[in-house]
Amino acid sequence: ILAGGRGERAKPITLQSADYIRSKALIPFAGRPLIEWIVEACRDQGIRRFYVVAQGVENRSQIKLVLGHGERYGVEIDYSRARFDPYNVGSGAATLHNLEQWNLTGTALVLPVDSLFEFSLDKLLAAQRDSDAVVTVAAVSRTPEEIAGKYGVMRTTAERLVCGFLEKPRLPVIEREFPEITQPQGPRTLATNAGMYLIDCARLRLAARTPELIRLAQQRLDWGNDLLPRLVGLGHRVAVEPIARLGDLGNIRDYLGTIGDALGGLYPQMDRALGAPASTEPRYWIHESSLRSKDHITGTTLAQKIAEGSVVIGPGVRIGRHVEIGAGVRLRGTDVGDGVDLHEGAQVEGSVLGDSAVIGAYAHISDSYVGPMVQVRSDARTPVRLEALSAVGDGAQLWSGTRLSGVSVYPRLRVPAVSGVPTGTQLTSSDDILQWV
């Protein structure tokens, strides 16, 4: 598991304070750190030995605190040695250096820690065996419009062997290089790299012992941009095998989209891990302790309020432990962490509410992230509104009347009743906030 990234694109989700970043592996996802889902999804397909490539003191200690050595999960987990951190320059270099460190010679699955995968290990193994490939690339099919300027494309033969790459091509280039996609009866999707690789460790280690790859592994060597093209250029067999789905978690938009897809049933492996929903029509999960919780105003339980219709839970909702929900609350497509307070009249859609967040009365939150311990001090007269990929970091406070659209608020900040802050603004300090007061 390649877990050394700093999570810069996902700020403020990855921030515990303005100057302390948590590992991407610990991004909260449906009630658990992301890396737990990854380990369990692999374990359930028969993988019992894990190697975590970490980077730096905080990254390594944070992950180890969650996973330990795998005892809780019935697996074995080892960690990269700290003295090799300076040599982990890029995902490809990190892989090659640690294959040598652990002296791995069998078959291994390499995957990043900031994505959610729906895949079949058996199909990847079969593709590797049938093609006699050094590397089998897990591929996701995407339309030209999805690919343009964002994803690299792989050229493949009829035998699903990679024969070339196009790095983030624009739409005209895609149409020129793949004319079949413009034909009425032609394919409408192309294979893109999902960032997951099944490798023959011994053969890959041998292939990497060329002067060029040895030099690059000391400078910068990424899987997609560097290692794969050079392996293909040197004549090594690199195969492609489609997987069902990939969800990126590296930025706010993709994070919210992926968790929405997961709660919407598009990741069957995660569905099984979540367990049976509390309701199948609409489909949602509510922990038993939350169904029994009484709000402090009406004194009625959540189960009673759902039954009488004063609280409406739509599809794609997960509610964690000991959540208190007031009358008039509406939820749809939202993940609600443990210990959250949702006061009367609050409406939340397409969002994530972190553990112990307090959402004030009549707040309107859509397509946004609200971190743990955030206080949204909304009221009926001056409600708070968050929308359009806004993100509020751990422990921040939003005062009544605040309206943010596509704005990020860093942890621990206190935001007064502001509006009109331009979309894309990052409020990282009190000085940033003062510009808009």
Each predicted region: which residue ranges?
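Conserved N-terminal catalytic core of the sugar/cofactor nucleotidyltransferase
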Residues: 1-2, 7-20, 27-123, 156, ...
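Conserved beta-strand segments of alpha/beta enzyme cores
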Residues: 25, 76-78, 161, 237-239
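Alpha-helix termination/capping residues and helix-transition junctions
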Residues: 44, 101-105, 118, 130, ...
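Residues at the starts of beta-strands that form the adenosine-phosphate
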Residues: 48-50, 134-135, 237
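Conserved core of the sugar-phosphate nucleotidyltransferase
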Residues: 64-67, 117-211
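Conserved beta-strand termini and adjacent loop/short-helix elements that scaffold enzyme active sites
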Residues: 80-82, 138, 241-243
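A short acidic, often aromatic-flanked loop/helix-cap motif at beta-alpha or helix-coil junctions
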Residues: 83-90, 144, 171-173, 246-248
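Left-handed beta-helix
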Residues: 115, 202, 206, 211-437
